[in-house]
């Protein structure tokens, strides 16, 4: 884990400038969630609007929304593909994202163009450097 001030960045994941993370699983699917920075900036999460299974997304599209006591924030797809699973636990317990932002994934995507799109994402070190500029 890399620490940047009060924020934690998990190694082995890919990151966007909008503070989503992507984890490539052994079967080639991708878990998506929001970073420690995002959950701390939002504050206590009250609701996660999960995407629909079967939804086709392009990289940068709105995947879903998360609602906190402070704001409603859009979560963007870090990769293109089809949503094949959602983390139903978050429907009843959105605070799991606050407790464990890198464990509480939001959706699993079957990617369409993974190799190309990963090149456009940041690794943990680059994301940590990016956080220092905010």
UniProtKB/Swiss-Prot annotation:
Keywords: Lipoyl
Gene3D superfamilies documented for this protein: 2.40.50.100
Residues that bear N6-lipoyllysine: 70
Free-text remark on how the cofactor is bound: Binds 1 lipoyl cofactor covalently.
A GO biological process held by the record: glycine decarboxylation via glycine cleavage system
SUPFAM superfamilies per the UniProt record, alphabetical: Single hybrid motif (SSF51230)
Assigned GO CC terms: cytoplasm; glycine cleavage complex
Source organism, top-level taxon: Archaea
Cofactor needs: (R)-lipoate
PROSITE patterns assigned to the protein according to its UniProt record, in alphabetical order: BIOTINYL_LIPOYL, LIPOYL
Domain Lipoyl-binding residue range list: 29-110
Family: Belongs to the GcvH family.
Quaternary structure and partners: The glycine cleavage system is composed of four proteins: P, T, L and H.
Role noted for this protein: The glycine cleavage system catalyzes the degradation of glycine. The H protein shuttles the methylamine group of glycine from the P protein to the T protein.
Protein's name according to its UniProt entry: Probable glycine cleavage system H protein
Source species of the chain: Pyrococcus horikoshii (strain ATCC 700860 / DSM 12428 / JCM 9974 / NBRC 100139 / OT-3)
